[in-house]
């Protein structure tokens, strides 16, 4: 299954919010500039109908030109990083791009996942 088949599915037509996890694994190999342009235009057409699209991608699995085009045309770009600091694994969400924000945006946000609780934002890191 590729990204084209996913975008052609009936579920995409009906959804207000579209989340495609590991979208980089669905991207075709060997895309030329026209293929990249067509995919971006297709995603823009879906978004222009008032629907939101969220794609999670692994930059190492994806065509770098396509990734650059997607990041350039996205309203919001978030990067997740992990660092080992003093024996602790620190996870950080970096707000790389946020167009039309209503106010100031915190550029880095610490987070963790706790068993039984789920996703937790470190409020000491958010101002």
State each model region's role.
Residues 9-13, 110-127:
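NTP-binding/hydrolysis catalytic cores, primarily Walker-type P-loop NTPases
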């Amino acid at each position: 299954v590729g990204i084209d088949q996913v975008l052609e599915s009936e579920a995409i037509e009906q959804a207000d919010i579209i989340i495609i996890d590991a979208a980089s694994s669905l991207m075709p190999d060997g895309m030329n500039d026209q293929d990249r342009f067509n995919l971006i235009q297709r995603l823009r057409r879906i978004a222009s109908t008032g629907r939101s699209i969220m794609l999670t991608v692994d930059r190492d699995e994806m065509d770098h030109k396509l990734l650059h085009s997607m990041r350039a045309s996205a309203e919001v770009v978030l990067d997740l990083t992990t660092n080992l600091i003093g024996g602790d694994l620190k996870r950080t969400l970096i707000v790389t791009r946020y167009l039309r924000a209503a106010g100031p945006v915190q550029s880095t946000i610490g987070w963790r996942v706790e068993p039984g609780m789920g996703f937790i934002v470190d409020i000491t890191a958010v101002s």
